[in-house]
Design a protein with these regions (language model features):
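Single conserved hydrophobic/aromatic residue that forms the stacking wall/gate
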Residues: 1-7, 12
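Beta-strand-turn-beta hairpins that frame and shape the catalytic cleft
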Residues: 44-60
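Surface polyanion/phosphate-binding segment centered on an Asp-His-Pro turn
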Residues: 187-206
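Conserved beta strand-loop-helix elements of the APE1-like EEP
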Residues: 16-31, 149, 160-181
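Metal-dependent phosphoesterases centered on the DNase I-like endonuclease/exonuclease/phosphatase
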Residues: 77-166, 170
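Surface-exposed cleft-lining segments at the edges of enzyme active sites
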Residues: 36-37, 62-78, 114-118
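Short acidic (Asp/Glu) patches
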Residues: 8-9, 31-47, 73-82
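Active-site beta-strand termini and strand-to-loop segments that position acidic
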Residues: 25, 49-52, 176-177, 202-206
Length: 206
């Protein structure tokens, strides 16, 4: 049955390891499945859609791994990915969405103190990488609209974390500042189950 969607997916490495996908009701002007750097394009982590009004980048940011073994790689990734997104934003307003694998502030993680600089996703290196997006003109639109709201988008499957709501907010919409006035609403839909992540949404008006 046709649902009138245009789809594109990207997965290069082992099945189940990484990958991104976008479904759209409108055919994009352009689809690109990499950032143009071999060292970062081996895991299918970025998908770019160019639309009439904005660019859309779907991302699955690398996890720094157990014992932070990939933290150096993650630091390099953050720099190169920001450069990529900044160049897109210079051409057209840009939305970046997906799993950023970082809890940006204490409000974004249920257990900040025991995880800080010990767990992947909550090191100062990763926090600084996210800060750089903000200092370069991108807005964490959920936190912009909900400065004090505690809501998470990911829970570890272990320790019944979902049932106890011991979670992390690591899934984001980062938008060019020029899109701020187009935002109607954004939400974290933690009422939905079926994954260790829950959906997030962004409503725009043009």
């Amino acid at each position: 049955m046709s649902v009138g969607l245009v789809g594109s997916e990207m997965c290069i490495r082992d099945r189940g390891y990484s990958g991104t996908a976008i479904l759209s009701k409108k055919k994009p002007q352009k689809i690109i499945n990499d950032i143009g750097m071999d060292i970062h394009d081996q895991e299918g982590r970025v998908m770019f859609f160019e639309n009439d009004d904005f660019n859309l980048v779907n991302v699955y940011v690398p996890n720094s791994g157990q014992e932070l073994r990939r933290l150096d790689y993650r630091k390099d990734w953050d720099v190169e990915f920001l450069n990529y997104c900044s160049k897109l934003s210079e051409i057209k307003p840009t939305i970046i969405t997906g799993d950023f694998n970082v809890a940006h502030r204490e409000i974004d993680i249920a257990r900040p103190k025991p995880n800080y600089n010990k767990s992947a996703g909550y090191t100062q290196t990763e926090i600084d990488g996210f800060d750089n997006f903000i200092s370069n003109g991108f807005i964490d639109i959920y936190r912009e609209l909900n400065p004090d709201k505690v809501k998470y988008s990911w829970w570890n499957y272990r320790f019944k974390s979902r049932e106890r709501n011991v979670g992390w907010r690591i899934d984001y919409f980062m938008i060019s500042s020029s899109l701020r006035n187009n935002v109607v609403n954004t939400e974290i839909h933690n009422e939905y189950f079926g994954s260790d992540h829950c959906p997030i949404s962004l409503d725009l008006s043009f």
